[in-house]
Regions:
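Compact nucleic-acid interaction/catalytic patches
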Residues: 19-23, 28-63
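C-terminal terminal-subdomain/extension
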Residues: 62-113
Length: 113
């Protein structure tokens, strides 16, 4: 499956026992890493408490597709994901929305110029 930055995908993550797993949506933040990896930002549907380092994902943020539930990005938790654990693609954020989330990420980690 072809994935690129701004895609939102469903991934299977194993717990430390390597026997049980959970499927989680992830924003593909940077996709041109070696070894078929990408930098992902986790997504949660637990939107009751929205922290300063989290951002709501609205249906209007998508250029195609959407998530099944209202959700938020957890910007403080970027991590490396193997493309081998991607189950399916939910959709793609519009370029304007993806740019906004990149800016929020950089603001949080103070990596802006």
């Amino acid at each position: 499956m072809e994935i690129k930055a701004a895609d939102i995908v469903l991934c299977e993550f194993y717990f430390s026992d390597l026997k049980t797993s959970k499927n989680r949506p992830v924003l593909v933040f940077k996709d041109n890493l070696p070894f078929d990896d990408f930098v992902g930002i986790p997504i949660s549907s637990q939107i009751i408490h929205l922290h300063a380092d989290e951002a709501l994902i609205e249906s209007t943020d998508f250029s195609e597709g959407l998530l099944p539930k209202s959700s938020k990005l957890m910007l403080r938790k970027p991590f490396i994901v193997s493309k081998k654990v991607v189950i399916k693609k939910y959709g793609t954020l519009s370029s304007g929305s993806f740019d906004r989330y990149q800016q929020l990420f950089c603001d949080y980690f103070q990596c802006c110029e």
